[in-house]
């Protein structure tokens, strides 16, 4: 379960160093926002993860649909955008405010919103250079279905604190693993 999550959300946190070589110049603040998201996710924890072990689930991340280990940097920008957008929406639903501190959620959404702004700029720049969208429709659909499964899980668990904790912990683990993906891209350069 963790390796699948790792690829999806690790892509979310590729820093400027991994993307800048594409001609997309994300500001230094983008990598600072990544660290801020990690800090905020840590601070959101309200339930002990060990008390929610029975609620863990395999959400079947579609690794192959997104190119797996063959994912190109240009496609990573699109994946980053897609995942960031869904993550933002995920933490913007009404049920999240019941479980977590509203001011922390606001800060998390602000950090994600800034990342979306940076990534949208890069998407427009890269699509302009290539003349076509960077993310294949199959990959986009796979990401949407994946987040839909997460939404269904929360609904099935009635947005319980443990269900939210499972999702938060998985996102946290995935964000933390982004360093490995970043190193992989650096070695390719």
Curated annotation (Swiss-Prot):
For this record, the Gene Ontology CC terms, alphabetical, are: extracellular space
* Matches recorded under CDD domains: IFab
Q: Which UniProt keywords apply?
A: Antiviral defense, Cytokine, Disulfide bond, Secreted, Signal
Recall the GO molecular function terms of this protein's record: cytokine activity; type I interferon receptor binding
| One of the protein's GO biological processes | B cell activation involved in immune response
Disulphide linkage map: 24-122, 52-162
Entry-linked InterPro entries: 4_helix_cytokine-like_core, Interferon_alpha/beta/delta
Signal peptide per UniProt = 1-23
SMART domains, sorted: IFabd
PROSITE patterns tied to this protein = INTERFERON_A_B_D (PS00252)
Coiled-coil residue windows: none
User: Where, subcellularly, is it found?
Assistant: Secreted
The protein's job, in short, is: Produced by macrophages, IFN-alpha have antiviral activities. Interferon stimulates the production of two enzymes: a protein kinase and an oligoadenylate synthetase.
Q: Which family does it belong to?
A: Belongs to the alpha/beta interferon family.
The protein depicted here goes by the name Interferon alpha-G
Organism source for this protein? Bos taurus (Bovine)
């Amino acid at each position: 379960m963790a390796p699948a999550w790792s690829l999806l959300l690790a892509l979310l946190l590729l820093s400027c160093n991994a993307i800048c070589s594409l001609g997309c110049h994300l500001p230094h603040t983008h990598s600072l926002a990544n660290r801020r998201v990690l800090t905020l996710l840590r601070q959101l924890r309200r339930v002990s993860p060990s008390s929610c072990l029975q609620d863990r689930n395999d959400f079947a991340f579609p690794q192959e649909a997104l190119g797996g280990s063959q994912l190109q940097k240009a496609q990573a920008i699109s994946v980053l955008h897609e995942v960031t957008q869904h993550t933002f929406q995920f933490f913007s639903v009404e049920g999240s405010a019941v479980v977590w501190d509203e001011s922390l959620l606001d800060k998390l959404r602000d950090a994600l919103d800034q990342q979306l702004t940076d990534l949208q700029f890069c998407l427009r720049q890269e699509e302009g250079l290539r003349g076509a969208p960077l993310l294949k429709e199959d990959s986009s659909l796979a990401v949407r279905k994946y987040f839909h499964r997460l939404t269904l899980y929360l609904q099935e668990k009635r947005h319980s604190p443990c269900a939210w904790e499972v999702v938060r912990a998985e996102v946290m683990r995935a964000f933390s693993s982004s360093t490995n993906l970043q190193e992989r891209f650096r070695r390719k350069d």
